[in-house]
UniProtKB/Swiss-Prot annotation:
Disulfide partners: 65-93, 67-82, 72-92
Keyword line: Antibiotic, Antimicrobial, Defensin, Disulfide bond, Fungicide, Secreted, Signal
Protein name as annotated: Defensin alpha 4
Signal peptide: 1-19
Keyword Secreted (UniProt): yes
Propeptide: 20-61
Family: Belongs to the alpha-defensin family.
BP GO annotations: antibacterial humoral response; antimicrobial humoral immune response mediated by antimicrobial peptide; cellular response to lipopolysaccharide; defense response to fungus; defense response to Gram-negative bacterium; defense response to Gram-positive bacterium; disruption of plasma membrane integrity in another organism; innate immune response in mucosa
The keyword Cytoplasm is annotated on this UniProt entry: no
Length: 94
């Protein structure tokens, strides 16, 4: 009877240790990829002369580009990729 109690205690201790390591892994994964952070990593604005040859007035178009994890939003177009701290993101411009 004492042996069964000791084996049960060892089994419970092993399950508890495994549950803690799984929780730590889940917490690490949750802190690495928070929704909403993806579009805040990098924002780039620049002037582009591409439309000035088509317009007589010579006005310049302004584009705003962001590095996003995953796909671009509806009104954005994919314009390349970004490498930030070894992670690859989509360069999305509008």
């Amino acid at each position: 009877m004492r042996t069964i109690a000791i084996l049960a205690a060892i089994l419970l201790f092993a399950l508890l240790a495994q549950a803690k390591s799984l929780q730590e892994t889940a917490d690490d994964a949750a802190t690495q990829e928070q929704p909403g952070e993806d579009d805040q990593d990098l924002a780039v604005s620049f002037e582009e002369n591409g439309l000035s040859t088509l317009r007589a007035s010579g006005s310049q178009a302004r584009r705003t580009c962001r590095c996003r994890f995953g796909r671009c939003f509806r009104r954005e177009s994919y314009s390349g990729s970004c490498n930030i701290n070894g992670r690859i993101f989509s360069l999305c411009c509008r």
